[in-house]
Amino acid sequence: MSHLKQLRTRIKSVKSTQKITKAMQLVSASKMAKIKNQIANSNFYIEAISKMMSDIVSIDMYELSIEEQKFFNTIPNKANLLIVMTSQRGLCRTFNYSIIKQVKNDIKELENKGEQIKLIIIGKKGYEALKRQYANYIDSYFELPNIHAENLMLQVKQKIMSLVVNLEVSNCVIYFNKFKNAMTQIMTRQQVLPVEKDHDDSKIENDHYEYEGENLISNLINLYVNSQINYALLQSRASEEGARMTAMENATNNANDLISKLVLKLNRSRQAIITTELIEIVAGSEAV
């Protein structure tokens, strides 16, 4: 009987866990759908800003102020800024692993070249994975908020702008997972600074911009850096929720399979006990 009690207790426990994983799956699915809409709504704006910035590279750099030129030119003997975007929480499969692996490989390559490195880490999981080995490279660490991330984007943008203007860094690369679908996230290494020229020169020849107004280029640089952070953050969050949704779906299915096996085991044990009791009753009646 104690064996049956243990099985019933375990079935109850697994069912309770299944309810939690199912709820987490539904929450992640809802969040992912919302973020996908945000990505769709912001794509045109981000592409337009990036296009204008790449076109500026084709103009004479002497038309820009000294501070503005720092965002378009690689300055020798300055640190490489690596922005690492990971998750704040776990339970999202290998979401963070591919990012951390690529960052470590790139750091090793930069170290072999004798180059300086600075890290900006966004998300607790990335910080925990890198702080022990690369604590001396970490310039800033930001926790990822559950909702509204406007303040986070502002802080990261200000930090990047400050490092570039003060000639502490030259190259800036951001690492994040790009969303493809709920089951597939693509590890992405995207250069933010210096701004790269559009490789399709025909586009630049066909478009013409007149840059007028005080601080117009500086304002555009601000918008560009902010848009790059926003793009990476949205992609990363959609990927994280997709990975978590898939992980929780798998956990829910596994729990369901385990419950079926435990119920079958419980029924067989009960049948065995009943059979034994019947045999004992029959044997007792025959003895009488």
Question: What positions do the PLM features span?
Answer:
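C-terminal beta-strand-loop-alpha-helix "lid" module of Rossmann-like NAD(P)-dependent dehydrogenases
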Residues: 1-288
